[in-house]
Amino acid sequence: MLSNFRLLNSNSNELTQEELNKLFEFYNMMSGSLYSRFIFRGESDRNLMRQFNVDTKTPGILSECLFMTGEKGRICWAENEGINPDDVSTGNFLRICTSLAKYIDEGLRAGDNRAKRIKVFCEKEEKFYDGIKKGEAFVGAYEELKPEVKRKVNLYYLAIAHTIGDKEYREISGYISTTTNAVIANRFAHDACIFGWVPYNIWKRRARRRTIDYVDTNQMLEMQITGLPYCDSAVFSNQEEIAIRCGLLPHFIIGYAVEQNFYVNPAIFNAIDRMHEIGSFREKFAYKRRIQQHGLEINQENFEEFCQRTNFKKYFTFDGDDYTMHRM
């Protein structure tokens, strides 16, 4: 995956042999893991400029931004607070259903190519489309769910709203789109392609510690057992979409590509150095697993001050338990 690129550090210098060895050790660790999945995000200079006031023409500064703040969903650019998926009240569930139905209807009336695709989706998923418009009928089933399952339902419905891409919701979306397919990522925007990963629990066991929220729009199994409306397939299944809540944290970024250059997250080198210091096989395995599930260690001591240089109106923190939104 990386062999086709000219590999550079965050200062735009070619990697030393030692750094190359560390990068490929990290890559091999991630590619052979059952606990993580590679993701890709195509990005445009226009979108980068809207966030950071810089783009791919100044990779040194862009690296500083991406490897400090990551990339944020538009909820962080907007004044509006949006809908909170952690609110598992019945009222919030009905609000989500009503909003999603409205976004689908508005998408159908858009008159563009996306509207045609949404129409195909609604015809194929008629049962879901009809059900989501009748949220009141599913209140009983929702109220019987455990709070954690309710939260996943909220995340799932809001991810569908994000994918449909209604103009109103798109401007305050609490997600960013990524894909498991690098070719697809470059189709969406080809000025830059961010490489990263998301945690993956192949055994579907409950984790001791919560990790970042995301929705794999092609996986419906968890929704099928709730008794609530769900889609038999993704809105746009060919996109192989992973919708990540709030944004892609720098802790889960490997680097980003601009044409034939690939800029590496410097936290990777620190992670491999730390791993080499661990003598015990068991401790080393636990350390690798921690990176795969919870990301790299990033020095964000001056994070809030750094964010003042961006166009973000808000930023979020995730402490392993809760997502918290902070105003600038």
Go through the PLM ranges and name each one:
Residues 1-328:
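NAD-dependent ADP-ribosyltransferases
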